[in-house]
Design a protein with these regions (language model features):
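The feature captures the beta-strand-to-loop junction immediately N-terminal to the Walker
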Residues: 38-40
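ABC ATPase nucleotide-binding domain helices that frame the ATP-binding cleft
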Residues: 46-49, 145
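Helix-to-loop junction immediately C-terminal to a conserved catalytic motif
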Residues: 53
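Conserved coupling/switch loops of ABC nucleotide-binding domains, chiefly the family-specific signature
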Residues: 59-62, 112, 212, 244
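Conserved ABC transporter NBD signature motif
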Residues: 61-69
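ABC ATPase nucleotide-binding domains
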Residues: 75-81, 85, 89-235
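Non-catalytic connector elements of ABC transporters
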Residues: 240, 250-361
Length: 361
């Protein structure tokens, strides 16, 4: 069954004096979807979230929620839930009172409130903390309570503004999975804001990558990672080898470009380009095979192994080419133990299907 559109932002524009924070931004959010707004500081992701929440009026454009035009509707009338990085729990109220607060505002009966609070605390796996105060809980537990308070009144859409940003990595990783499980089990609709690429990749059904007030690309995490549409997308999501070249051949099996140093390599291109045109080439480090001998891959680069860095289970190899430019390959630690030494002449090889060729900046 086709999912309904829960939210639409149409050509939303927002300026602060001469600064354009959002430039004609449009997105659709489907029912039950987990959509992440991802981008660096100043990309416009929080500005867009605040416009959707009704906390920041856009200069122009439209915001539709559940089929109703709500561009300038007050925040409390939009039926949305919000979770912030600072938890926003009332320190003088117990956990029960914090979670019950939105239900009391909706004038629910005491028995219904008791039932809902117990249910949502069980959902976030903190069933025995009703009488405690926020200060008695850890940061991770407080964030779970903030989530519980948001879930308890079953908002149409939940907006999350970098809710895990203040937590350490281990706890952040754990709560990422927990939020994703809650989303999957409850079927809630979520818009999530983060600058953390890994967080976006782990949690999202789709990612909306933003840069300088514009949407660079929207798609599944896999699409953005393996099929970036711009240099910014290729560079922002994960690590990549990027270089320019001129188109010398186009065929069904791929496009061939030539670098300034004369090295020719092939990849997949979705753009319409002409022979002789300058384009950009991307290959992910994990898709490169490192060897002392030339392998069977369609593409290869030969050079001096400049540096080897072990990072736990992964090892990075830095290859210096004849023009002193650099390529990086990543392999599982131990796969070349003892066989490769810094200073060796080595080959980096990769498949045409793993490389992307793109226009633009």
């Amino acid at each position: 069954m086709e999912r309904q559109v829960k939210l639409q932002a149409k050509n939303v524009r927002k300026t602060y004096g001469p600064v354009v924070a959002l430039e004609g931004t449009s997105i659709d959010l489907l029912e039950g979807e987990f959509l992440t707004l991802l981008g660096p500081s100043g990309s416009g992701k929080t500005t867009l979230l605040m416009a959707i929440a009704g906390l920041n009026d856009p200069d122009s454009g439209e915001i539709w929620i559940d089929g109703e035009l709500m561009t300038y509707t007050p925040s409390h009338q939009r039926g949305l839930g919000m979770v912030f990085q600072n938890y926003a729990l009332f320190p003088h109220l117990t956990i029960y009172e914090n979670i019950a607060f939105p239900l009391k505002m909706r004038k629910m009966s005491k028995s219904a409130i008791d039932e809902q609070v117990a249910r949502v605390l069980s959902t976030v796996q903190l069933p025995n903390v009703q009488e405690r105060f926020p200060a008695e809980l850890s940061g991770g537990q407080q964030q779970r309570i903030a989530l519980a308070r948001c879930f308890v009144y079953e908002p149409s859409i939940i907006l999350m503004d970098e809710p895990l940003g203040a937590l350490d990595k281990k706890l952040r990783d754990s709560l990422q999975r927990e939020i994703k499980h809650l989303h999957d089990n409850l079927g809630i609709t979520v818009i999530y804001v983060t600058h953390d690429q890994e967080e976006a990749m782990v949690m999202s059904d789709r990612v909306c990558l933003m840069n300088e007030g514009r949407i660079e690309q929207i798609g599944t995490p896999s699409e953005l990672y393996f099929q970036p549409k711009s240099i910014f997308a290729a560079d922002f999501l994960g690590e990549s080898n990027l270089f320019a070249g001129k188109v010398v051949r186009q065929a069904a099996e791929g496009m061939t470009i030539e670098r300034a140093d004369g090295v020719a390599v092939s990849g997949i291109c979705d753009d319409q380009v002409s022979d002789g045109e300058t384009v950009h080439y991307m290959i992910r480090p994990e898709n490169i095979r490192v060897s002392l001998d030339k392998g069977s891959e369609e593409n290869f680069a030969r050079g001096k192994l400049k540096e080897t860095i072990m990072i736990g289970q992964l090892t990075k190899y830095f290859l210096e080419l004849a023009d002193e430019s650099e390529l990086v390959a990543t392999t599982l630690t131990g796969s070349h133990r003892g066989s490769l030494q810094d200073g060796d002449e080595v080959f980096f090889g990769w498949s045409t299907n793993d490389a992307r060729i793109m226009l633009g900046s």
